[in-house]
Curated annotation (Swiss-Prot):
Organism of origin: Mus musculus
Tissue-wise expression: Highly expressed in intestine and at reduced levels in lung and stomach. Also expressed in thymus, spleen, lymph nodes, T-cells, B-cells, and macrophages.
Stated family: Belongs to the immunoglobulin superfamily. BTN/MOG family.
Role this protein plays: Negative regulator of T-cell proliferation.
Chief site of localization: membrane
Protein name in the entry: Butyrophilin-like protein 2
Top-rank taxon: Eukaryota
GO biological process per UniProt: negative regulation of T cell receptor signaling pathway; positive regulation of interleukin-2 production; positive regulation of T cell proliferation
Length: 454
């Protein structure tokens, strides 16, 4: 008989479990990326990297770079070859797989001609079979905008406004004003607007007294690039003479126009001054983009608002007298509101403001009736194609107002109002009920419904 050493069953089981826990799964790995964000300027290329640990070949793995959804990769490789037809929208032709050192598990994504929309987090995922690990890489996109331009607009009553403008920034920059001794000055208004390309246009306004002799500076700072653009203006050099020498006159009353017709905005210099060598800008709320810009004898198309492209023309017959008329063709409801007409030279402007009222007279009302179960009657008056929102009123045969049961207004794609109003009638002796729909400027359409024989 052979004697065997005594081992407890529980001890054997514990030892076996320990061995299992200390043996790594054959697919066990992790992924690491850069500790700091990757900074890239708009228009340049960005290189994002990640590393498989422990280091080993990725030849038989699936590797993908993606933003938020793994099923929509920026780029993906499987078994050493790119999987085509999958690039996320916006990255076609710009995302490139870089052969960094795939034998050691190092991969890289190059994004060409970086855009503002590329800013943000990316994920690098390695997958082998059903086992995967990933890490995130932060791409910070930045763009240094243009040198600021400070222009002066005269407001009268001892005050002027300084407007600091610049374009081409990303992300949104920080803007501040300083006086001659470096003291901070508070902005009157700030507008930082992203353009179609994702870059920010900056427009900050400062109010000052026009008898000031200070030098004032506008600073625009990029936190991402840690760089500043600045501009300085000495108020005493311009305001005493140029702003006081001329004023701009516009319409004193709002200009009403119907949808589809042409809007005419006329403004002129007083006293009469030849404006051929001046810059003239028609604006809405901001300096840029503009409704229409005239400079150096021609229209500056590159500064025009998208919604006005192809719809404006300039009448310059009296430009030698300082008079110009802007025509806005095919008026829309969105054209309603205030416009600013600026005449300027060398960054000094005077302005006038003109209000435009856009209206649309709708269809002739249509009245239909419905007999109710209780013996009463409900009249429904409908019409469409109105702007602005019209006033609706029911009147009896003597012209007295009758309270409506309900009123409903809906706006369609062109912002025109559709009207529906209900009237409950219980008095069978009532005849000649009128539905009236009118605009604030007095335009009115009516329909009459004779209530007889019921």
């Amino acid at each position: 008989m052979v004697d065997c050493p005594r081992y407890s069953l529980s001890g054997v089981a514990a030892s076996f479990l320990f061995v299992l826990l200390t043996i790594k799964h054959p697919d066990d790995f992790r992924v690491v990326g850069p500790n700091l964000p990757i900074l890239a300027k708009v228009g340049e290329d960005a290189l994002l990297t990640c590393q498989l640990l422990p280091k080993r070949t990725t030849a038989h793995m699936e590797v993908r770079w993606y933003r938020s959804d793994p099923d929509m990769p920026v780029i993906m490789y499987r078994d050493g070859a790119e999987v085509t037809g999958l690039p996320m929208e916006g990255y076609g032709g710009r995302a490139e797989w870089m052969e960094d050192s795939t034998e050691e598990g190092s991969v890289a994504l190059k994004i060409r001609q970086v855009q503002p929309s590329d800013d943000g987090q990316y994920w690098c995922r390695f997958q082998e079979g059903d086992y995967w690990r990933e890490t995130s890489v932060l791409l910070q996109v930045a763009a240094l905008g243009s040198s600021p331009n400070i222009h002066v607009e005269g407001l009268g009553e001892g005050e002027v406004q300084l407007v600091c403008t610049s374009r081409g920034w990303f992300p949104e920059p920080e803007v501040h004003w300083e006086g001659i001794w470096g003291e901070k000055l508070m902005s009157f208004s700030e507008n930082h607007v992203p353009g179609e390309d994702g870059l920010f246009y900056v427009e900050d306004t400062l109010m000052v007294r026009n008898d000031s002799v200070e030098t004032i500076s506008c600073f625009i700072y990029s936190h991402g690039l840690r760089e500043t653009q600045e501009a300085t203006i000495a108020l005493s050099e311009r305001l005493q003479t140029e702003l006081a020498s001329v004023s701009v006159i516009g319409h004193s009353q709002p200009s009403p126009v119907q949808v589809g017709e042409n809007i005419e905005l006329t403004c002129h210099l007083s006293p009469q001054t030849d404006a051929q060598n001046l810059e003239v800008r028609w604006l809405r709320s901001r300096y840029y983009p503009a409704v229409h810009v005239y400079a150096n004898g021609t229209h500056v198309a590159g500064e025009q608002m998208v919604e006005y492209k192809g719809r404006t023309s300039l009448v310059t017959d009296a430009i030698h007298e300082g008079k110009l008329t802007l025509q806005i063709h095919n008026a829309r409801t969105s054209d309603e509101g205030q416009y600013r007409c600026l005449f300027g030279k060398d960054g000094v402007y005077q302005e006038a403001r003109v209000d435009v009222q856009v209206m649309a007279v709708g269809s002739t009302p249509r009245i239909t009736r419905e007999v109710l179960k209780d013996g009463g009657m409900q009249l429904r008056c409908t019409s469409d194609g109105w702007f602005p929102r019209p006033h609706v009123q029911w009147r009896d045969r003597d012209g007295k107002t009758m309270p409506s049961f309900s009123e409903a207004f809906q706006q369609g794609s062109q912002e025109l109002f559709q009207v529906e109003t209900l009237l409950l009638v219980t008095n069978g002796s009532m005849v000649n009920v009128t539905c009236s729909i009118s605009l604030p400027l007095g335009q009115e359409k009516t329909a009459r419904f004779p209530l007889s024989g019921w």
